[in-house]
From Swiss-Prot:
Name of the molecule in the record: Protein BCAP
UniProt function note: Acts as a suppressor of ciliogenesis, specifically, the initiation of ciliogenesis.
Keywords recorded for this protein, A-Z: Cell projection, Cilium biogenesis/degradation, Coiled coil, Cytoplasm, Cytoskeleton
Localisation per UniProt entry: Cytoplasm, Cytoskeleton, Microtubule organizing center, Centrosome; Cytoplasm, Cytoskeleton, Microtubule organizing center, Centrosome, Centriole; Cytoplasm, Cytoskeleton, Microtubule organizing center, Centrosome, Centriolar satellite; Cytoplasm, Cytoskeleton, Cilium basal body
Main location class: cytoplasm
InterPro entries: Odf2-rel
Example GO biological process: cell projection organization
Coiled-coil stretches: 98-177, 206-282, 394-506
Any one of the GO CC terms: ciliary basal body
Family, similarity comment: Belongs to the ODF2 family.
Length: 548
């Protein structure tokens, strides 16, 4: 009984396993060869298990057939006393055994049917395996074709990668050239800025110099006017003295002593006049020297202006070279655009070839649509990503190059504007120099006219002195005749004469003070001229250090 129960449970397990296998067979037949080999091994194992179960069932039936006559013999040998009780038990056992035998026969029949079904399934699986093997062979052929196509595409992609690398190297070289051009433009800007700063400094220094010269010229004109006023005062004083002297001469024609004293005073005055003439000549020579120095400075400034013009010409040449470089860069941009168009056409050709290959693969791989679709999607994504990356990289590089070119154009426009401003400033400075030269010429003409007036005034004074000397000599002759008559009057007039002598001494001291003041003013003017010269030398040295 236990053996039959075990056989029933094992048969149920096999039936459930068969049902699970039959359910698994309902799945799509896309398994590989490894799955088929596993199925074959499972079927063989099930066969061995079923054969073992058949053997056990046959042994059980044989043992039951052998036990039936033994039971009959035992029943006959049992005593008739216990026959009533044991017969019922034996009959029950027999009925149970018969039922079990019937059940076993039914199970055997079921197992036979199950085995037949399994054999039919095995044959079906063999047919499916053959179909799968054939399908796998076709898949292998298609896979090999796809691999060959993939290798071709990889080779083409490698060629494209090498071409892209060469393009990247060219683009890096172009970027280096652009950086060099940027550095050169920055250096040009810095040099132009330094030159503009130097020009501004020079213009400021030149303005200060002009202001200083104008101040010096005003001071000199004021000093000359003061000297003219002093000379007019001295002339008026000399005229007053002459009038007073004439009165004295008229009153004291007979006094020889007074004549001698007057001669001495005249000699002193002549010496003073000679000193004044010498000082006037020295001052005129100094003024002429100053004018010559100012003219020399104007010549140096004109030379500096010519140098600045040459620097402007060099700057214009540099701007023209930068413009030529910009034209070259624009040509390079055009070449890059043509290369981009060529690359786009190549990418379109590659995409068309890929589409042709995809259509062929679709025609060949209708049965294996899922795998081919996934692969085609991946290939499409790779191609699109590659093409997009190349396009985006080239577009970004072109955009960056355009931005750089626009920045360079803006910088060149700024340089042109700055150069125009510098030209305007230089034109204004030249106009200022022309005005200053005209002013200097006018002032030099005024100074020459003043010097001529001074010389004429000195000549007139000399003539007047000579005339007065002649008059005095004639009067001396007349006085010698009247000396005898005027001896008595000399005593009375000595006191008056002493007073007049005191007055003349005071006037002489006043004249000496005026002469000292004039000398002091001349020394101041000389010191100012020396300071101007030192300042000019400092400006020249600073200009040489700034502009080389």
């Amino acid at each position: 009984m236990e053996e039959t129960a075990n056989d029933g449970s094992h048969s149920e397990e096999l039936f459930s396993h068969f049902e699970s296998r039959s359910e698994k067979e309902g799945l799509p037949q896309d398994a590989s060869e490894s799955h088929l080999s596993c199925l074959k091994q499972d079927i063989q194992n099930e066969k061995t298990e079923l054969e073992a179960l058949f053997k056990e069932a046959e042994l059980a039936t044989c043992s039951a057939e052998l036990l039936l006559p033994l039971f009959k013999d035992t029943i006959e040998e049992i005593s008739f006393e216990n026959r009533g009780e044991s017969l019922s038990n034996l009959l029950e056992k027999l009925t149970d055994n018969e039922r079990e035998n019937i059940n076993l026969k039914n199970k055997v029949l079921e197992k036979e049917t199950y085995i037949q079904e399994l054999s039919s399934l095995f044959q079906n699986e063999k047919a499916n395996a053959l179909k799968a093997s054939r399908f796998s062979q076709s898949v292998k052929v298609v896979h090999e074709r796809l691999q060959s196509q993939i290798h071709k595409k990889e080779a083409e992609n490698e060629k494209l990668k090498e071409h892209i690398k060469s393009l990247e190297t060219q683009i890096s070289e172009w970027n280096l050239q652009l950086k060099k051009n940027k550095y050169e433009a920055v250096a040009m800007k810095e040099s132009s800025r330094q030159k503009t700063i130097a020009l501004k400094k020079a213009s400021k220094i030149y303005k200060q110099r002009i202001e200083h010269f104008t101040g010096d010229m005003e001071n000199l004109t004021s000093q000359i006017r003061e000297q003219e006023a002093k000379l007019s005062e001295t002339v008026s004083a000399s005229n007053a003295w002459k009038s007073h002297y004439e009165k004295i001469v008229i009153e004291k024609t007979e006094l020889e002593v007074q004549i001698e004293t007057m001669k001495k005073q005249i000699i002193n005055l002549l010496e003073d006049l000679k000193k004044m003439e010498e000082h006037g000549k020295i001052s005129c020579e100094e003024i002429l020297r100053k004018l010559h120095s100012i003219e020399y400075e104007n010549e140096t400034l004109n030379l500096e202006n010519t140098k600045l013009k040459t620097t402007l010409a060099t700057l214009k040449d540099e701007i023209a070279s930068v413009e030529n470089e910009l034209l070259e860069l624009q040509e390079v941009e055009k070449q890059q655009k043509t290369l981009i168009e060529v690359y786009k056409t190549q990418i379109q050709k590659v995409q068309e070839a890929a589409e042709m290959v995809k259509s062929r693969c679709k025609n060949l791989l209708q049965e294996n649509s899922l795998i081919t679709k996934n692969k085609n999607k991946k290939l499409k994504k790779v191609d699109e990503n590659h093409s997009l990356l190349t396009k985006l990289s080239l577009e970004e590089e072109n955009y960056l190059i355009q931005l750089k070119c626009e920045n360079l154009k803006q910088k060149l426009e700024q340089m042109d504007a700055e150069n125009k401003e510098l030209e305007k400033k230089l034109a204004n400075q030249e106009e200022c120099l022309k005005h200053s030269n005209l002013k200097f010429k006018e002032k030099s003409a005024e100074y020459t006219a003043l010097a001529r007036q001074l010389e004429a005034a000195l000549e007139e004074g000399r003539q007047k002195v000579s005339e007065e000397i002649e008059k005095m000599s004639s009067r001396e002759r007349a006085l010698q005749v009247k000396i005898v008559d005027l001896e008595n009057e000399l005593r009375k007039k000595n006191e008056e004469q002493n007073q007049l002598v005191c007055k003349m001494n005071s006037k002489a001291q006043h004249q000496e003070v005026c002469l000292k003041e004039i000398q002091h003013s001349l020394e101041k003017s000389e010191n100012q001229n020396e300071s101007i010269k030192n300042y000019l030398q400092f400006l020249k040295t600073s200009y040489v250090t700034m502009f080389g």
